[in-house]
């Protein structure tokens, strides 16, 4: 059975190989690059794949990044090995999953916000089902000092509403011209998160009160 990772923390920074096996060379691989970002569905609570940064050609010419589907690779001896199948990478992967790559979102570092406008921190590690990509939970970070005092909170998947445009921080968008009004985005969570935090003994009411913004 194919093995795949189940958290963004396990994937980002990993070296990636491309399967180049043939009947005569069943273990042949080629270096592809290193995982730069994890990518999520624009409207669903789902991990769809990751972006691999390729090494520059002759240390001078930048090569295009490669998008790999969440199910387009196996973990072999601790290394990510990307399948040769056309639906494993690029446009083929997006077509197979029914997503538009330019609409997809990078969750890492986005603010985590309640429906009432409370900002709980930013997205840290995200856990998901390796077989489907469905998000199981995410951790919220408030910076090293706050994390040391309060601990890193985990928000279960059923309380995560998903990505929401128009609130939060400015996004990096493909094709956006300089001078255009920035597009904002955040990860929206249920207001039940505040109660969950108090029950877990990691109440951060003071932090939340100073980080409440209008949702209008």
Please tell me what each predicted stretch does.
Residues 1-216:
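Peripheral interaction segments used for macromolecular assembly
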């Amino acid at each position: 059975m194919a093995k795949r990772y189940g958290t963004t923390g396990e994937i980002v920074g990993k070296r990636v190989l491309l399967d180049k096996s043939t009947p005569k060379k069943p273990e042949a691989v080629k270096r592809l690059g290193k995982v730069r970002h994890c990518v999520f569905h624009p409207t669903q609570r789902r991990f769809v794949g990751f972006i691999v940064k390729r090494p520059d050609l002759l240390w001078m010419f930048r090569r295009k990044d490669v998008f790999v589907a969440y199910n387009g690779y196996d973990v072999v001896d601790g290394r990510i090995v990307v399948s040769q199948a056309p639906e494993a990478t690029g446009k083929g992967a997006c077509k197979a999953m029914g997503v538009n790559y330019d609409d997809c979102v990078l969750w890492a570092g986005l603010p985590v916000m309640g429906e009432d406008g409370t900002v709980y921190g930013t997205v840290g590690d995200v856990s998901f089902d390796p077989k489907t990509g469905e998000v199981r939970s995410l951790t919220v970070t408030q910076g090293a000092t706050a994390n040391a005092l309060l601990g890193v909170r985990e928000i279960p998947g059923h309380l995560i509403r998903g990505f929401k445009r128009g609130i939060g921080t400015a996004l990096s968008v493909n094709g956006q011209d300089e001078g255009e009004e920035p597009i904002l985005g955040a990860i929206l969570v249920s207001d039940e998160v505040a109660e969950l935090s108090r029950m877990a003994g990691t109440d951060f009411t003071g932090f939340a009160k100073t980080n409440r913004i209008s949702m209008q």
